Amino acid sequence: MKYVNKPVPKTDAMSLVTGKPVYTDDLAPSDCLIVKILRSPHANAWVEEIKTDAAKKIEGIACVLTYEDVSHKRFTLAGQTAPEISPWDRYIIDKHVRFVGDPVAIVAGETEEAVDKALKRIKVKYRVEEAVLDIHTAKDNPILVHPEDDWYMPIPVGGDNKRNLCSSNVEEVGDVDAMLEKCAYTVDQVYHTKANQQTMMKTFRTYCYMDHFQRLTVVSSTQIPFHIRRIVGNALNIPSSKVRVIKPRIGGGFGAKQSSVSEVFPALVTWVTGRPSKIVFSRKESMIASSPRHEMEVHIRMGADENGIVKAIDLYTLSNTGAYGEHGPTTVGLSGHKSIALYRHTEAYRFAYDVVYTNMQAAGAYRGYGATQGIFAVESAADELAHKMGMDPVKFRELNMPMEGEALPGYPDVPINGSCTMDKCLARAKEMIGWDEKYPFRDMGNGKVRGVGIAMAMQGSSIAGIDVGGADIKLNEDGSYTLALGCSDMGTGCDTILAQMAADCLDTDMKNIVVFSVDTDISPYDSGSYASSTTYATGNAVIQACGELRKRIHAFGAQMLGVSAEDSDFDGEKVRTEDGKEVTLQQIAGKATCGVCSELQVVKEYSSPISPPPFMVGAAEVEVDKETGQIDVIDYVGVIDCGTPINPNLARVQAEGGIGQGIGMVLYEDVQYTDKGKIRNNSFMQYKIPNRMDIPKVRIEFESSYEKTGPFGAKSIGELVIDTPCPAIANAVYNATGVRVRELPITPEKVAMGILEQEAGEKK
């Protein structure tokens, strides 16, 4: 292969560093109405009266819309394939506001000044009620977040709005309680992860206009163009055929833009007024009214026999979906399905969960999508079990880790683990971090100690039986190719990776591949860029489309030469016969566009019945100041099995970025609320994410397997890489200090207090 498995530079790298790409707001017409939202100051209240006359009289105001002006048909903002598994529990604006930041009115005007003035002129009378702000008391609470009778769940997954349940389920194989009784060693602990913000560089932003056919065009920074088309249609109660969605450059998403956070507001304004409009969320709005990671509490019981073989896992996840249920029923599933499976000998397991409504910001998708929370719990518990047995945590994992050709307990998306080098990943990570020399800790003097920790992880490659990747490849008259895609490049480099695949399939130079994405009127259908699906699902579609197009080009060239395809060869540049006759690709392309009914264009869709998991081992070295509790990550290594890395450089950058986000989750990030349900840390002044000085040396290596169902043997990588930092660093902190922190983030205060409690206990 000329391009696949090669570190090809991103096709847009130079334009990015020179500032040439334009983003959503750069493209918006100058005559757009400015759209802003009046948001609720209360966590749970009913709008008894809203006066908008004064606001409407302000010069330049085009419309002021309230709950009286919107469709009263419920819908969901979740970017999921229909029928969505998330409940339909929203109106665009509702009389019942359910969190601080819920929309109360939409204002659109000629200038930002006029809109800001109008927002202040709107007078609202609320009936404020007590809010549900604790996940532990939400279930069966007499205060209902969704008391309405038209709450609707397209797919029944245990939701009951009259119990504050978005979803609830129990899966069980074997007799877990009996097996745990037989185990020689058990642990029984609770682990708690908090909500985290995605903090992408570009906030949510959308502009809309009516085209000359009176169709609504939505231009938006989104990961899910085709789902946005359906969601906007549902929200406005209009046919999806009346909606066109165009994705410019995104400016980051990390899952936040897998929900339709901003699109419905300007879409409604443009539909009502007929005028172009735009909305640009402030950073504060993106932090109080978006779709952060689900807060989860995971109670785990784990048991092993006298030899260290894990026999039983009992896992219960309590997940906080907030005021609305986007992605609630699906994220929670990964907390068990992607964590229990890490221990291949498990004979009995139970995975139960409740997803509860609260009067807090609605959660959504974030890289890792629930697996991150579950893996933190299981990999922390695994270390605790190993320590209880007096066994090295690496040895413990060597005995239990996933192996190729064996089953993955609790993972429903592959019958047998078809591709896996976890054993090599573990051995290499152990070697790279210097485990034997550094475990469990080293005293560095001056009150500082260093410890090492390790963790395993797995994810998926698209959603089995649901996700669809699409590719449309055509030969242009000059011999170049246009590759139209329905997936969104969020900065991951998928446009480059898919062009690499196409170039190798067609035996052409990458510069001859022009990539176009995404316009729902032109691009082939694609579920969107989420669930680590693009390389695997869309990559397979690209390979199939290019393979078919290559056959057609060959056959057409052979026809031009008066021979059959079997009696000629095509090398990507020319079709040749053994007697020396030949025709060039450019000649074929030119002929195909002139008086010949032979279209040299192929559209293919791909969906997989399985989701082959990639695997990873992460190992961390931390330094802890025993007096202050300050934690510094000194070194982090990640060894990854993502099948064939199509572009090792881009895969490495993906890993480095995901590890950085994981470090933020484990050490810094925590969406905090007041007792009235207001978010305290709603800007970068208060919400701490790691900067460059907080990220250590990160070293990435690949131990490639070959996934026979993947494009060129590839699996996914995008989400997997955020899953190991939380448990690896938590385990390293424990090994350094003896303090086990089970609630994230692990702050200096928690560590320092833990050390003091240890010392007090020793004195007794």
Please provide the spans of the model-predicted regions.
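Flexible, low-hydrophobicity surface segments
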Residues: 1-158, 596
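Glycine-rich loop/linker segments at domain edges
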Residues: 6, 12-15, 82-83, 160-206, ...
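Catalytic phosphate/nucleotide-handling subdomain of diverse soluble enzymes
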Residues: 461-523, 538
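Extended active-site and interfacial segments that coordinate phosphate-rich ligands
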Residues: 11-15, 120-127, 131-133, 223, ...
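C-terminal catalytic domains of large/alpha subunits in multi-subunit enzymes
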Residues: 67-68, 237-242, 272-277, 306, ...
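Short acidic, glycine/serine/threonine-rich loops at helix termini
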Residues: 74-79, 118-121, 220, 229-231, ...
